[in-house]
């Protein structure tokens, strides 16, 4: 998210060795609020031969109890390109361009992609999650990171543009992670990671959108149910 989604962006939080001293971690209310979000992703890497590569893209996200819906913001020309394939056979699953629906049922995340043009819901088995850039974590899908990881970070006095939101930071062996966490919305507003050598930098900016959209997963009646294996050549 396909560039890695937020879960991959902050994998370092799970593997960095020593846990730093922390201030009191934010309490997690029993029920997280419904959210409609706009998310902007940016990454920059410097290769050993001095080439800088940058990528940026945007998504929308709807969060409801037991449901998370992500959709890539696509340029108009991308839709035109898709229409150019009508009438032909498409190989593979272009999951990066399709809305992603994650459900939490019976303590287990369920993943599907939705092809609106073909009116099809494509179920992804857990054994194939890694092939479609999903790490299988419901918490990271719902909160954009695992809230417990904030306990491994130090709350700093860095100024926050959002009342009540606090910066949580950590650094290990020249690699840093920074999270601006909003305890009211229970979502990170900004996430940054990088190294002091400047070989990589990644940033995610999250903005709450006004209003609450209708749940798109409630509008899939009549869609064909397909399997991921249908798209494997």
Residue ranges and their predicted role:
Residues 23-26, 31, 161-165, 171-177, ...:
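Non-transmembrane domains of secretory- and envelope-associated proteins
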Residues 50-139, 199:
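An acidic-aromatic
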Residues 38-40, 154, 205:
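Ser/Thr- (and often Asn-) enriched beta-sheet segments in non-cytosolic proteins
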Residues 115, 119-166, 190-192, 215-221, ...:
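Solvent-exposed helix/loop surface patches that form functional interfaces
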Residues 54-59, 97-100, 144-158, 175-176:
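Short small/polar-residue motifs
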């Amino acid at each position: 998210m396909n560039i890695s989604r937020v879960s991959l962006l902050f994998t370092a939080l799970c593997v960095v060795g020593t846990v730093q001293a922390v201030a009191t971690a934010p309490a997690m209310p029993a029920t997280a609020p419904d959210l409609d979000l706009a998310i902007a992703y940016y990454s920059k890497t410097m290769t050993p031969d001095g080439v800088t590569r940058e990528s940026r893209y945007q998504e929308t996200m709807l969060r409801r109890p037991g449901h998370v819906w992500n959709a890539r913001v696509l340029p108009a020309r991308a839709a035109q390109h898709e229409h150019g394939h009508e009438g032909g056979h498409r190989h593979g699953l272009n999951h990066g361009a399709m809305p992603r629906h994650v459900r939490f049922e019976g303590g287990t995340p369920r993943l599907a992609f939705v092809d609106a043009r073909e009116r099809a819901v494509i179920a992804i088995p857990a054994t194939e999650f890694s092939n479609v850039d999903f790490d299988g974590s419901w918490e990271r899908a719902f909160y954009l990171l695992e809230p417990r990881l904030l306990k491994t970070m130090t709350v700093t006095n860095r100024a926050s543009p959002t009342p009540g939101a606090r910066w949580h930071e950590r650094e290990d062996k020249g690699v840093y992670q920074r999270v601006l966490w909003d305890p009211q919305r229970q979502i990170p507003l900004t996430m940054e990671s990088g190294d002091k050598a400047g070989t990589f930098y990644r940033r995610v900016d999250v903005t709450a959108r006004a209003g609450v959209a209708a749940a798109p997963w409630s509008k899939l009646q009549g869609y064909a149910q397909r399997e991921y294996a249908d798209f494997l050549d």
